[in-house]
Structure formats: C-alpha cells, structure tokens
Amino acid sequence: MARTASSNSTKPRKSKDNGSTHDGETKVQPELDLEPEPLWKKILLAIPRAFGSGVRAVTGVGEYDPAYRRDGLCFLLLVLAVLFCASEWFRVSGPFGQLLHAIAAGVLGLMSVVLPVLLAAVAFRLMRNSGKGSNNPRVVTGWVLLMWSICSIIDVAIAADHTGFDITILQSAGGLFGFFLGSPLAWGLSNVFAIIIFVVVGLFSLLMITGTHVTDLPEDARKIAAKIQRKPYVPMGQETDGSASQFPNEVRVGDTTLAFADGVPSHDGDDDGSDNDQAGDARPSLFARLFGRKSKTEDDKTLDKYAADDPFDRAASQHGATAETPVVDPMTGEIIGARTIASSSYDGRPHLSSPAPAADADDGDASRTRVITSGQTVAMPGGGAVDDPWAPSAAQAGTVALAGAAGAMGAAGAAGAAAAAAATGAYAGADADGSGVGQGVPNTGGQPNATAGNDTDDDANRPYQLPDLNLLTKGQPHAMRTPANDRVIRALTSTFEQFNVDAKVVGFLRGPSVTQYEVELGPGVKVEKVTNLQRNIAYAVASSDVRILSPIPGKSAIGIEIPNEDREIVHLGDVLRSDKAVGDPNPMLSGIGKDVEGHFVTADLTKMPHLLVAGATGSGKSSFINSMLTSIIMRATPEQVRLIMVDPKRVELSAYAGIPHLLTPIITDPKKAAQALEWVVKEMDARYSDLEFFGFRHVKDFNEAVRAGKVHAPAGSQRKVAPYPYILVVVDEMADLMMVAKNDVESSIQRITQLARAAGVHLVLATQRPSVDVVTGLIKANIPSRLAFATSSATDSRVILDTVGAETLIGQGDALFLPMGSAKPIRVQGSWVSESEIRKAVEFVRTQRKPKYREDIEQMAKEAEKKDSMEPDEEIGDDMDVLLQAAELVVTSQFGSTSMLQRKLRVGFAKAGRLMDLLESRGVVGPSEGSKAREVLVQPQDLPQVLAFIRGETSSLEATAPQQPELGE
C-alpha cells in the first residue's frame, strides 16, 4: 500500500502518456496539488476524514495520499448512488432501505428519484476533473441551486395550501429543501410570484452549471441553429469574411496553414461540420463543459503536437475499425440515420438495421419472404430460410451505395472512397437473381398508378420490406398523477360531505383523456345515492361530461369518469411499438389507443370478426379509420392482407390510392360499391368450396397446410394452389350506400357478416348517422364488435351499443369499445396518426410494388351497369310504347297539352297526366302553367335523341342547339 509519512508531502502521479512522443512534442511535468481545498470538499470529506483519523489513531499508520483520498470520495459517492437507487427506484422494503428513503424524500421530496443520478454524475466528474484549476465548485453550486429551485416550485405547487409542518406531506412534495425556502416566499408574496422567482433562480443555476454567460447566449443559439440546419457555423461579425468562403476547409494553427481536400474532415471531430472556425475561438460543447476533462492552458496546447496531423491520425485510427455510414431514405433522399460498418470486412454491401433478404437465384418463391424491420425474418408461403439476411435488394443497393461511398470517403480519404464506391457499384449493378442486369433506382415520385396494373417480374422477385415503425411519431410519456387529479379528489370528497353520503375516494386510474376515480361506499349506503348525484358532481368538478359506472367491472367500487384538463395525444406509433403489439405477429392487428388505465389497446380483426364504427362529425371516426389502415400497412404485406376501400366522400381515403394492398381502385360510386360487395360474396363462396374440397374448417389452417406443402391441386388440374390473403372491406360512410342501393347492400352485408369469418373476409362499416334506417337490425345482429365515438343523442348510442353512454363522451377520439365477448364497453382514447405519417408509410410501400387489381371486380361493375341500362325504367313500367308515342306527338307538334294526348292516344285524363309528368321528369316539357299548354323544351330535329333517352339507350338528353350564322362573311 502506497502511503506517505505526513499529509504535507504528496506523491506525483505518473503521466498518462508513457509511450514515445511525436517529434516536436514537449512533455509537461504535472504540478503538485497544493491549493487549499474548497469548503464544499471539506464538508463532503468530513465523515471519511473523521473515520480515517480514528483508524490512524488506533493503527498508528500515516495518512493516505490526496489522490487516493479523492478516489475514495468518488467511490463513496458511487456506493451512495447505488444505495439510494435501491431505495428510490426499486423500493427496497428492508429497514435500511426505508431509512434511506426517509432521508432522501425528507430532504428532496419528489426529487429524491434523481438523487442517484446526481451522485453518480458528481462522482464521474470528480474522477475526470479535479485538482488545480477545477471548476467543480461552480458546477456543484449550480446543481444545488437548481435542485433547491425545483424543490421549492414543487412545494409551492403541492404543499402550499397545507398549514404546519408535516413530514409526510413534505415527502410527497418538495421536502425540506422546498419547505424552508418555498413556504416563506409563498406566504409572504403569493404562489405565482414565488414560482416566478424560483424559475429565474433555476435559469441562473443552468448558466452556472454550463459555464455560460448571458452575453454568450446569442452565439450559442447561432451554433444550435447551424447544427439543426446542417450548415457551417459562422461566428458573429464574420459573415462577410471572404476568406472563409474561399477556403472552407482551411485550418490555421499558429503560423501553419494547411488546406485539406474536399471530403476530408478538417474540424475537431464533430460530424455536423459546424465548428470549422478557428481553433482558438471555438467554445466547448455543453456535454464537454459538464463532464469533459479540464482544458489545457494556452501554454500547454501550442506545442502539444503538429495540428495538421490530426485529421490523418483520426482517419488512420478509423481504418480497420469502424466507420459511420449514413443511410439514405429511398423516398426522399434524406439521411435518416447512420449505421456502423466494419472497414476491414467491408464487402460493398451496406449493413442495415432493417435488412432486406436477397432473392435467391434458385428459389422462385423468394418474393414471399417477409422482412420485419426489427431484423426478424418470417417465412411466407412457399418461402424458405433466407441465406443472407444482410443482402439488400437491387434498388436498395443502388440507393445506399452512394451513402456507403460517402461514409468511406469521410473515414479513409479519397482512395478508400473510390474503392468503396467501386465495390458498391458492382453490387448495385447485379440483379436479384444474379443476372447482372442493373435495375436502377425506383421511381420515388410517389404518384399512384391511375389504371389497374399487374406486378412486373421485378416486383414479384423483389422481397417486400415492411415500413419501419420509426416513421411514426413518438408521443410524450404517460403522466400518472397531476395536480388536477388532487383538485378533483377534493371536490368529490366535499360533495359527498355536503350531501351526507358515506363514501370516499380510494384511488384513481388516469388515462389520456379521462380519469376514473374509484369510490367506495360505507356500510348500508345505496349505490343510487352516488349515481343520483351525477349533476352535482358535474357541477363540483366544472365538467358536463361525467360518466358513472356502478360498479366497476371486477371491483366493489363505483367508477366516476371525469375528463382531464390536460389531455394527452395517443400516437399510433406508441401503440404499434408497445410490447402488446410487437409480441403479436398477426398482420390484421390494429392499434386502437389507450384505456382509462393508460394501457395500450389493440384489436385483432380476425377475431372480431367484423366491426361497426359510428360517431358524430368531429368525434374521431375518420382518425380511427386512418389508424387502422396505417396499422395494416405497417404490419402486413400484400400477400397477407388485401383491401377494398369504399369512400363515397371521395376525400377521406384518397391518401391510400395506389398502395399494393388494394384489390381495386378506391371506390367512390355507391353503385359500384354494391357490385364490389357482391364480388366479395362470390369470392367467399369460392373459398368455402376450396375449404370443403380440401377438408379444412378455416382459411388459416388451409394457408398453413399450403405453406407446409400438404395441399396440392388435383391431378390434371392447371391450377396452382396458393395461400389465401385476408380480405378487409372498409366502408367509410354506410349511409350513402343505403340511400342508393339499400336492398343489394343490406343483403350482401348480411351474407358476408354471417359466413365470411372462416373464409378470411372481414368487414369494417363506419357511419356518422347511426340511425335505424342505416344500421338496420339485420346488419347489427351479425356484427358483434362495436366502436362508438361521441354521439348526439342517447338514441344513437343505443343503436350502436344497445345501451346509453356514447352521448356523454367528450369527442376528439374518446370512444367506447365493445369487442366480441365483452359484457360492457371499454372506454378508450383513439390513437392518432397525422397526414405526414400516412404519406410516409404510403410512399414507402408504393415505391416497392404497384397495385395488382382484380379485373373481375371491374368487369362485374361494367356488366351491372350495362344490364341496368338495358332494363326499362321501373317508373315507366308497361307504358313504354305509349310514352314514346306521346313524346313524338309533343315534340313534332311543339304543343304540350294533356287534352291533346287524351284525344290522339285515346287514353283517360289520369293516364294522360301521368304521361305528361314522365315527359317533364325527362326534360321534354316544362312545368305545368295552369290551363295553358306546357312549354316544349326540345326541337323536332332532336326527336331521335329524345326517344333514345327514354328507352335508356343513352345516359343523358343531348339536345342540339340551333346553329347561329357566322359573322364576317
């Protein structure tokens, strides 16, 4: 053990640079740390020194070297950090853990959870920055002021209304730190002004911690803006300096000037290239000022080493190790991230975090291999194991090749970049099947295919890659408790006391939009005493949207659901990234949102098996449809799920036009929608015929048997047996379809909902008018799963859910979800996906494949339209011949009289009047003018067009106007 005889002598530490130095370097011997210790260090070292003095008095040994004392202090702080971590984070229930929690919470209150982090940060800083010239006192003082201000703000916000000294309240507020300063200021001034003062103190403490002066804030803001915009940083006052723009890669050190070639980094190592100013003027970053080593003095850095060698040494150190290669978004061309590639084993293939398996030359079913963005590969129908999961497709290799060359240029210079570019170019030129024919870069325009097209051979052989879940926005963390919840609890308790109801609030569950408060009743208290107070409770909490559950399912308590003052947005990306969604590989899984407990809610459309969605305008119905469709796009390939979208509004689902999952272009005509539903019925019957022939009860079992090679076509048949994809039919507005073709639509929906579950066909119906003429009894009886958003009346709520409750929802995604098999609906906050997120996901799948439409659907629509045009109008009935004669008489005579039709056609007055009304509805004559004859609207030369229109041979009456003589002849 290394010790010294007395505390006045110190042992010099070894220099960290034990190897040979570069030519021209000057070694500087470390100076002795004889500076008096600051006060904060004496306080921290008081207990260890007292313990050490006692040990030395007993053993008679000398004092440790100051360097070892400093190391001992650092490890003591780390031990304390571990102990407080056990008590504050993991809630160790032992006596020692309770004592530590009492100390930490009593001093810091709620901020005791950050105490382990602070202790570890102080220990880390003492290890790296100590001794002469250290700025540790300033940093520690700044942290103390920051903690004091935060604790005071918490004390004023939570415990200011409580009088007296109660340690239990202080532990759940700001602790002693906040009480000694927060309570006096709140009592002397007010809560608002006290918080303002503490905010100012907190800002000042941040300046102390970072070592930033107020005059440096504009310069720091310019640096941050330059990094965000990815532009070179130009100091204030040097914007018009011509030398900087003429030599952007020039480095000046003393009297030495060296200009580097383009592509070689000439700054201090930052990848953004924003710190290319002079070395003497550059200020350290925020992280360096907090945790970096102590900077050298001006005398030490002038002769340290030849500064022009730094970029070359850095490039040489990266060669053979790792290099950061940017990954380019194939849709926008922007750099979306960086992946580490080993330079020594670089083979020209970019290593992506979301690998795309290469198509094997000997495997014809490689197009059925599904690539999960997390790196997991799942074999699709007929596909085998992927040999090389890191090999990208030809289009991806062509896109990422430029990124790989750029990363190699920044790491190993121009020569290494040329070699890397040659390697990636050779790989990108190879076809997926090994033919060596370059595929080029796919079209990234994002324009959907306007006409029905088929997949090309390149699309069929190219592996399909699912979009990365990182395309979807991440939301804010869920708040478990806010001051608003405490105010509501006090209001509920006061209401029960005012009406002499023996009930108390025992807990609450905070959701994103509403909070459910659990109320327990005393002995002998009826539930009706609380439910009858609904209006009084709404008055007490200042909210009209109060919903009471009596009781809460599975609990002996009454639930009072009250909207939150500070609502949270549930992002679809958070739902799909949750453990519940990631652990379920079902491609038909859809993200619903969050329940009142803050848990993520998902729905498997194959188990629902059909869904009815209803809600008033602005309630969040369209947002749910977008979330459901985006979930399908993010999780399913076109081989797994095919979509039929019906959008009578023409604009709600237009963003999904051209995606490869579509079976037909988005249908906007209600008549064509009825024909599409009839096609779905025929497809369902065909699937049931296959299931019956091959002996399966569900399409899922049939698909598994096909993938396993257990199902084969009959001998002599030319058919190729392939797995059936799920078919999802989405109708955005049910009311428009029921108005145009109610009988056909209702019968088709009835057959689909009754039989289509085992065939893999599922239906989602949405409407904003949930009346009995739209959601009929036949439709509702076969759709067990319901999702009700805010409705305008309790009657509409009963139509959807068969119970009231939807009329009390607050809108904007607040919904009641009743899945199949559930006794009572679940209140959820629907997930939200923005238009930009939808556009990114849609463009990602568009660039991989073109939609492959079913031609028989369009053919059925054309045949039905032709058949309707050939059939006589039901309004005319058997009077077609008489009507044609009446039209000929009226047009040729230019006299629209009912009495003339009576005489000429020998019909009664009632039938003559009916014929005249039919001619008026078809634009032949004008409206009735009393006893006068009606005006004839067409000319005699237009008689053939009129007769053809009445027969139904043309779609419109095209009357030719008389030609005007040309002037100027």
UniProtKB/Swiss-Prot annotation:
Positions in coiled-coil regions: none
SUPFAM superfamilies, per database record: P-loop containing nucleoside triphosphate hydrolases (SSF52540), Winged helix' DNA-binding domain (SSF46785)
Subcellular location: Cell membrane
Gene Ontology CC, one term: plasma membrane
Sequence intervals crossing the membrane: 72-92, 102-122, 139-159, 169-189, 192-212
InterPro entries named in the record: AAA+_ATPase, FtsK/SpoIIIE/SftA, FtsK_alpha, FtsK_dom, Ftsk_gamma, P-loop_NTPase, WH-like_DNA-bd_sf, WH_DNA-bd_sf
Region spans: Disordered: 1-31, 260-291, 311-367, 438-468
Residue ranges of domain FtsK in the record: 598-798
Polar residues composition bias: residue spans: 1-10
Binding-site residues for ATP, renumbered to this chain: 618-623
Segments of skewed composition (Basic and acidic residues): 15-30
GO MF annotation, one: ATP binding
Topological region Cytoplasmic: 213-969
Its membrane topology: Multi-pass membrane protein
Keyword ATP-binding: yes
GO BP terms in the entry: cell division; chromosome segregation
Record keywords: ATP-binding, Cell cycle, Cell division, Cell membrane, Chromosome partition, DNA-binding, Membrane, Nucleotide-binding, Transmembrane, Transmembrane helix
Primary location group: membrane
Matches recorded under SMART domains: AAA, Ftsk_gamma
Known role: Essential cell division protein that coordinates cell division and chromosome segregation. The N-terminus is involved in assembly of the cell-division machinery. The C-terminus functions as a DNA motor that moves dsDNA in an ATP-dependent manner towards the dif recombination site, which is located within the replication terminus region. Required for activation of the Xer recombinase, allowing activation of chromosome unlinking by recombination.
Domain notes from UniProt: Consists of an N-terminal domain, which is sufficient for the localization to the septal ring and is required for cell division, followed by a linker domain, and a C-terminal domain, which forms the translocation motor involved in chromosome segregation. The C-terminal domain can be further subdivided into alpha, beta and gamma subdomains. The alpha and beta subdomains form the DNA pump, and the gamma subdomain is a regulatory subdomain.
Subunit structure: Homohexamer. Forms a ring that surrounds DNA.
Family classification: Belongs to the FtsK/SpoIIIE/SftA family.
Protein name: DNA translocase FtsK
Annotated source species: Bifidobacterium longum (strain NCC 2705)
